[in-house]
Amino acid sequence: MNVPAALPPCSILLLAGGRGQRMGGRDKGLIEWQGKALIEHLHRLTRPLTDDLIISCNRNIERYAHYADQLVQDDDADFNGPLAGIRAALPLARHKWLLVLPCDVPLVDEPLLQALREKAVECPERPIMVREGQHWQPLLCMIPIAHAATLEAAWQAGERSPRRALEPLQPVALQLEAGDPRLANLNTPCLLTGISENCGK
């Protein structure tokens, strides 16, 4: 496995759960983009970076199992959002850090993930979160698994927003420019089509 020794080993969580409301109820991770399922694009990117690849999913378990070392499912069938997947994965992570990615950002690249890990070396006790311009991207982050209990307590108190759950831990920003194309979120059919056309030019 080609993981630079200077960077902390990490477990990686791919978030593929959810209702897929903007996709007409389809399982977003399995929707094809440029001839491959979205989850396959993220698998190809992250597989060389970890020996603990976790996927959070609520359906099509057999298909997702092909891409993961571990699968996690929400303990609630109501699709309570990405924080549900994060809280389920943190106690199972085999490394001290959990790197989190949604399944609908296929343009994210290895330098971005490596930059997150480098920032984690600088600030080992705090979550690292991508900040695009003035906007936080809480689903592109690294979380020390030591904070699992804090996030669980936030969940039990009724919090469902990953950003608000992480706020008390004073996340450190990995600052990116507004409009960074790597952060394109392909969460509607129109966006999928538009990005595909632009990439083909």
UniProtKB/Swiss-Prot annotation:
One of its GO terms (cellular component) is cytoplasm. Its EC number is 2.7.7.77. It catalyses: Mo-molybdopterin + GTP + H(+) = Mo-molybdopterin guanine dinucleotide + diphosphate. GTP binds at L15, A16, G17, K28, D74, D104. Pfam families: NTP_transf_3 (PF12804). One of its GO terms (biological process) is bis(molybdopterin guanine dinucleotide)molybdenum biosynthetic process. The keyword Magnesium applies. Keywords: Cytoplasm, GTP-binding, Magnesium, Metal-binding, Molybdenum cofactor biosynthesis, Nucleotide-binding, Transferase. Mg(2+) binds at D104. The keyword Metal-binding applies. It is found in: Cytoplasm. Its main location: cytoplasm. GO terms for molecular function: GTP binding; metal ion binding; molybdenum cofactor guanylyltransferase activity. The N-terminal domain determines nucleotide recognition and specific binding, while the C-terminal domain determines the specific binding to the target protein. Belongs to the MobA family. Transfers a GMP moiety from GTP to Mo-molybdopterin (Mo-MPT) cofactor (Moco or molybdenum cofactor) to form Mo-molybdopterin guanine dinucleotide (Mo-MGD) cofactor. This is Molybdenum cofactor guanylyltransferase.
